[in-house]
Amino acid sequence: MAGVRARAPLPLALLLSLPAAPGGRDPSASRARFPQRLGRAPCFEVGLRKPPPPPLLSPPSFSSGSSRPLQRPRGPKDGAGRKVCAKLVKRLPGESGSCEDGQSAPAQPPRRRTGTRACPPRAPLWR
């Protein structure tokens, strides 16, 4: 009984004292995590790392070599697609003709292209 009680406080004290004394361990761990996230954040690296996880969902798409087209449609549909739909829905009730004649139609293509190139916040979702 006495031995168990003596052993319990020792690990707790050591655990509390270790992270408190060597402050370099905390930053080192955070630094090790940051480079990994930063490396996956860029569009180029994310695009190269995206294919491995999805093959289980759709292997024929990757085998056919249509990985690029799959990324483009998913970007606008998830990211810019919602924004464009929201604006169209707001304008449609008023006048659908004025929406098309206005700047809604020409604004859709550039937003979709910029969304895919601007690295949408879907990188963490694929992880």
Swiss-Prot record:
The lineage of its organism: Eukaryota, Metazoa, Chordata, Craniata, Vertebrata. Residues 1-23 form the signal peptide. This is Putative uncharacterized protein UNQ6190/PRO20217. One of its GO terms (cellular component) is extracellular region. Keywords: Secreted, Signal. Residues 43-127 are annotated as: Disordered. Residues 59-70 have a biased composition (Low complexity). Its main location: secreted. It is found in: Secreted.
